[in-house]
Amino acid sequence: MVAIGFDVGGTNVRGVALERGSPVPLATRRSKTETDGDVLVDTIVEVAEGLIDDLRATDDSVVLEAVGLGIAALMDANGIFRYAPNIPGVFDYPLVERVKGRLGVPVIADNDATTATWAEAKYGAGIGHDHMAFVALGTGIGTGFVLGGRLHRGAHGYAGESGHITIERGGPEHITGARGPWEYFASGNGLGILAREWAAAGRLDSAIALAGSVEAILGEHINELVDANNPEVEPLITEFADSVAIGMANLVYILDPEIIVLGGGLVGLGEMLRSAVEASLAGRILGRDHRPAVPVVLAKLGSRAGAIGAGALAFDATR
């Protein structure tokens, strides 16, 4: 018996086939994300059936037990795909019901940050911690929480949209129309904005040399500079880490986690980012000399965490 976990983002639909209790994919497949609900269902079904076919090529006894969907969207507790800024054209769509009707097995769905949170809690950097916050720094910011050993989803399934917490009242306008949200400053896009500001001020010439111009500088160029141990980049990462820590401090005050797991594409910045975030966070906590420190650790499961967690949650739902 296998489950298939999906990570459905704005660009790709990634599927992994898993055995119960294991984070190691038996097979993987990927396809393009479509912006029509019915076509998206077709894509998910095609990937799922392809994975089962791949497994049956060597073992014809393989049976699909359940499917888990981790989606970069507002997914409500009834499996309705409500809204996703990166998947335009799909609103209030009964995604779980439609996929279940096509595949004939139990189907669950959650936000992709929530499923990645569960993967890290169950198999990764959060093992052994009943109170954990997961912060994924990518194009935006996704978060998820384990409280008392269980995922915290909130009343309607929408808990974890922390990237939209207001950090600066009346601050710069985000693509969502909100002003001064955390992810404007502390995401991959935020790192690019900060790097361009530094370069324009003559503080990051090495990034200009890589990108060709100030305007062309992106977060990926900063990754290259970190990998090359370029001395110009460490002060930039320290300032960026402070923006990350501001939002994390809010989570610490509200949730009191034992540990914060740092995931998403920006974990490629590695120890330089992690240590700077942890130091900045420690300095922002009231009464820090009289309470346990909250360690910040790097996620362990990489880009497949969302799909692995979705598969694990699908198995959990069939117990």
Mark where each language-model region is.
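Glycine-rich phosphate-binding loop of actin/hexokinase-like ATP-binding domains
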Residues: 127-189
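Residue-level detector of high-confidence beta-strand sites
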Residues: 26-28, 84, 154
